[in-house]
Amino acid sequence: MEKCHERRLKLAEELKSCQKAFIALGDETRQQIIITLLESEVHGIRVGEITDKTHLSRPAVSHHLRILKEAGIVSMYREGTRNYYYVSAEETIWKQLGNLFSRINEIVDEISEKECSKSQIEIESNKDFI
């Protein structure tokens, strides 16, 4: 039982480390901005281009980009006075999310195996009543 509790604590810790990313990814408008960035040129696009493609106001796009940037999902580089935004290639947040989903998958598999075993035991014990 102790091992199970430790795994749940580790999962909670990993979930906390990904909270900003989940909040950022949980908004449909930000999802649309990410899709727009992924569909754009490799070098990134400017706020005005995102505004044109998403039909959002400049302040709205800037607000959502700030949240995505703070979450480590979007990066920006400056060329003169122009800012270009792109989906971040920094591995940290993507590795954290990948590790979290892997751990969730392991726990779900473990629970499924236990439920299958429990069902099998119930089937076996019900044979006595037939």
Question: Locations of the language-model features?
Answer:
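Amphipathic alpha-helical dimerization/coiled-coil segments
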Residues: 1-18, 38-39, 88-130
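N-terminal helix-turn-helix DNA-binding core of bacterial DNA-binding proteins
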Residues: 16-57, 81-92
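Base-recognition residues in the alpha-helical recognition helix of bacterial helix-turn-helix
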Residues: 35, 63-64
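Alpha-helical residues within the helix-turn-helix
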Residues: 52, 63, 69-70
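Short amphipathic alpha-helical/adjacent loop interface patches that line ligand
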Residues: 54, 65, 101-104
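Small cofactor-carrier domains centered on a conserved lysine used for covalent cofactor attachment
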Residues: 57, 61, 76
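Beta-hairpin "wing" of winged helix-turn-helix
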Residues: 69-80, 86-88
